[in-house]
UniProtKB/Swiss-Prot annotation:
Gene that specifies this protein: ppp4r3b-b
Summary of subunit composition and partner proteins: Serine/threonine-protein phosphatase 4 (PP4) occurs in different assemblies of the catalytic and one or more regulatory subunits.
Residue spans of biased composition, Polar residues class: 750-761, 768-790
The protein's name in its UniProt record: Serine/threonine-protein phosphatase 4 regulatory subunit 3-B
Function noted in UniProt: Regulatory subunit of serine/threonine-protein phosphatase 4 (PP4).
GO biological process: DNA damage response; regulation of double-strand break repair
Length: 820
């Protein structure tokens, strides 16, 4: 038999009775040797992988629903569905199934499975007819009918037979006529029996019966029967709610009567499932799988019908963005779109893509920009939900819109800034809306879901846009709440310092925690953009002011921000921290925390432990030299003693290097390892080159002058010229110190980083200067050097030239690269 491929979507029913999408592929029916029978195979259209392999069991009950669905159960708790793109494909596969089972393809349901014990039981009862005999539909037989319906639920074959009888004889409509009679007669006993009957029929789980029960003619009577639960003292008033309380609002008149009927039906059936029917027990869960499917595919049909009606959607958008539309009407329109987007989640991926593209083309994002700025909380909440659907569907689509918008609008009205402002101004004490919006912002600025093509890079374009136009809005509350606090540089370490402006308001603290979470995300996932911003705004210093907050969670957020920065092990950041003495507020917090063994204590110690374990030398030296006296009393962990040990080991290594180098090279010039100096400069200059080459974000509103790179660069050019002139006049001389001879290659080639032996040895082997500088003082080296500030500094300096050395601590071997 030849394979027939049809495009399908595979669904499975999960524990919550919701259909899970397992993928799109092409179905075929073929003989599988391993399964020893005809089977249904679905291969994914993306990569050809096997999505489904299911043997067509002769005893499995297959159901065909709504012309394009085939549903069946593989095991007791495993339901499957194939949703076909075309009716013809569904019909063809249905014929294959019926052919294997020996059934007429005109039926919509094949036989249910019969377990062996039940089959034997029926063989022992030859008098059992093919169909169940139903009692006549009259008041006196209601108890008998109820007993019959209840008794068949445990038997798959009897459920199927009862369903066939009910469908063929129009029995349900007769039962509903009896319901009306019982209500008119106030026949409570009869109404209780009808409740059991209708509930049992629902548990038969048959789509054909649902079509009858949920028709316009019958559904309200079905709801009426379900009001009379015998377990309740008084009947519920579900019909009153559905007809009077629940109002169907047509934001724009729906001209398609079939669509209107489908919407009414879906709402009422959902109400039956969610409100009226009791929560099913473990044994009853599978009884309502078809009801779940009925609702699911109804929603798919509603979305498809609305999407195809272009006039309807165009009119909705026109009214939504019209300034003349009153607030009540706009609220209804936004709520409609929220429901519409929620229903769209039932669509297959390719249809969902088309749906959101339709909304985008009609202008959903500019419309959201308007409604998110409204005062109505309900409207803003609905707009946020719609925005979340769009961001989840396509972050790139939203990013593209806001970047185009930035060319025509002020920063204040940009969509992302409107979203940030909504997050900042959330009036909910628990900041529920702000948390949701923060998650959406994080998705939008996440480089992991940004596209990179040959012609353009979304990441660099969008991050440039975000840091230029949006970051100042995001950080405004943080900067405002830390603006008046002045850090006391000369404060005695360990003293209690209380900030008068540090936010102690719980809601403000929560908001700042959210902002810090986003900024921490930026540190982890953005490179030079966030680095530029932190430096220009001195952001870490401002963040660490929050270590004074009485809310420990906010202090921890501030600490986490610093921990992520240190975790990058970037010397650029390390120099910034050292220069700003930014460990001071952290150590204040540790000491003020006292002997309390809490999360703050552990987090601070972990920060220092990380520095110790990773052996970050610059930070280790800074901490030990400046704070060890305050920390040495902490003995319940060995972290700080370990830092001191690391520091001393490094000093010993430098001393050993110093002892192996001739005294002529011992100079204040090399206060630290020259290689470390070169590495730092290489990092600094490379980053600057990278930033220029990648058209990085220009500095945003500088609050302090840029680092000294441009000025230093000018000094370097002046120095280089002076040095070249001097080299022409003063040739290098050979100098003798004891029995050791050393030639200084004081030439243009050396200044330009030529690989001469001597210039390399100075850079590679000169250790930090020690207190013993006498030997260099006695050296008879004669070199003429210009002594004015900013002029040339010799390769070897004398200890009394310290002031000049502070001005110029750059390795001469590295600098010439800048002038090239």
């Amino acid at each position: 038999m030849s394979d027939t491929r049809r495009r399908v979507k595979v669904y499975t029913l999960n524990e919550d009775r919701q259909w899970d999408d397992r993928g799109t592929g092409h179905v075929s029916s073929t003989y599988v040797d391993r399964l020893k029978g005809m089977s249904l195979l679905v291969r994914a259209e993306s990569d050809g992988s096997l999505l489904l392999e299911s043997k067509i069991n002769p005893n499995t009950a297959y159901q065909k629903q709504q012309d394009t669905l085939i549903v069946w159960s593989e095991a007791e708790n495993y339901d499957l569905a194939l949703s076909f793109q075309e009716k013809a494909g569904c019909d063809e596969i249905w014929e294959k199934i019926c052919q294997v089972q020996g059934k007429d393809p005109s039926v919509d349901v094949t036989q249910d499975p019969i377990d062996e014990s039940e089959e034997e039981r029926f063989e022992e009862m030859p008098e059992t007819s093919n169909l169940i005999d139903l009692p006549t539909c009259e008041l006196g037989k209601l108890e008998e009918i109820a007993d019959l319906v209840t008794s068949v639920l445990s038997s798959p074959i009897r459920r199927e037979k009862l369903a066939l009888v009910l469908e063929n004889e129009g029995y349900i409509k007769k039962l509903l006529q009896l319901f009306q009679t019982c209500e008119n007669l106030d026949n409570t006993e009869g109404l209780h029996h009808l409740y059991e009957i209708i509930r049992g029929i629902l548990f038969l789980n048959k789509a054909a019966l649902f079509e009858v029960m949920f028709s316009d003619e019958c559904i309200m009577d079905v709801v009426g029967c379900l009001e009379y639960d015998p377990a309740l003292a008084q009947p519920k008033r579900h019909r009153e709610f559905l007809t009077k309380t629940a109002k169907f609002k047509e934001v724009i008149p729906i001209t398609d009567s079939e669509l209107r009927q489908k919407i009414h039906q879906t709402y009422r059936v959902q109400y039956i499932q969610d409100v009226i029917l009791p929560t099913p027990s473990v044994f009853e869960e599978n009884f309502l799988s078809t009801l779940t499917s009925f609702i699911f595919f109804n929603k798919v049909e509603i979305v498809s019908m609305l999407q195809e009606d272009e006039k309807f959607l165009s009119e909705v958008f026109a009214q939504l963005t019209d300034e003349a539309t009153d607030d009540d009407k706009r609220r209804e329109l936004v709520n409609f779109f929220k429901e519409f987007c929620a229903f769209s989640q039932t669509l297959q991926p390719q249809n969902r893509d088309a749906f959101f593209k339709t909304l985008a083309n009609l202008g959903i994002l500019p419309a959201l920009e308007i409604v998110m700025g409204m005062d109505d909380l309900q409207v803003r909440a609905a707009a946020t939900d719609i925005f979340s659907y769009l961001v989840e569907f396509s972050p790139s689509m939203v990013r593209e819109f806001v970047m185009q918008e930035a060319q025509q609008s002020d920063d204040d009205i940009l969509l992302i800034n409107v979203v940030i402002e909504q997050m900042i101004c959330d009036s909910d004490p628990e900041l529920g809306g702000a948390v949701q919006l923060m998650g959406l912002l994080r998705t939008l600025i996440d480089p992991e879901n940004m596209l990179a093509t040959a012609n353009k890079t979304e990441k660099s374009e969008f991050l440039n846009f975000f840091y230029n136009h949006c970051m100042h809005v995001l950080t405004a509350p943080l900067l405002a709440n830390t603006a008046e606090d002045k850090l006391e540089k000369d404060a005695v370490l360990g003293s209690i310092k209380t900030s008068t402006v540090c936010p102690d308001n719980f809601q403000t603290a929560q908001l700042l925690a959210l902002i810090l979470e986003l900024l921490t995300f930026c540190v982890e996932h953005h490179t030079y953009h966030i680095k530029n911003y932190i430096m220009n705004k001195d952001l870490l210093r401002r963040v660490l002011i929050l270590m004074n907050s009485k809310h420990t969670f906010l202090a921890l957020c501030a600490l986490r921000f610093m921990r992520r920065i240190i975790g990058l092990k970037d010397e650029f950041y390390n120099r910034y921290i050292i220069k700003g003495n930014l460990f001071e507020p952290v150590i204040h917090a540790l000491l003020d925390n006292g002997t309390r063994y809490n999360l703050l204590n552990s987090a601070i110690i972990e920060l220092f432990e990380f520095i110790r374990v990773e052996d970050i030398k610059s930070l280790t030296s800074h901490i030990v030299e400046n704070f060890y006296k305050a920390l040495e009393s902490i003995e319940y962990v060995q972290t700080f003693k370990g830092l001191k040990t690391r520091y001393e080991q490094e000093k010993d290594r430098q001393s050993q290097k110093l002892s192996s180098v001739p005294s002529i090279l011992r100079s204040n010039r090399f206060r630290r390892d020259a290689r470390a100096l070169e590495d730092d400069e290489e990092l600094w200059f490379n980053e600057d080159d990278e930033e220029e080459g990648e058209a990085v974000v220009p500095p945003v509103e500088k609050t302090k002058p840029e680092d000294d790179f441009p000025e230093g660069y000018e000094k370097f050019l002046e120095t280089k010229k002076a040095k070249e002139l001097e080299d022409k006049e003063n040739l290098p001389k050979r100098t003798s110190v004891g029995g050791f001879k050393f030639t200084f290659s004081h030439s243009v080639s050396a200044a330009n980083g030529a690989n001469s032996t001597n210039s390399k040895s100075v850079a590679a082997h000169t250790p930090p200067a020690t207190s013993n500088g006498s030997s260099s003082k006695n050296t008879s080296l004669t070199t003429t050097v210009a002594s004015t500030k900013g002029s040339l500094i010799g390769l070897v300096d004398y200890p009394d030239d310290e002031d000049e050395e502070e001005e110029e601590d750059t390795s001469p071997r590295k600098r010439p690269r800048l002038g090239s």
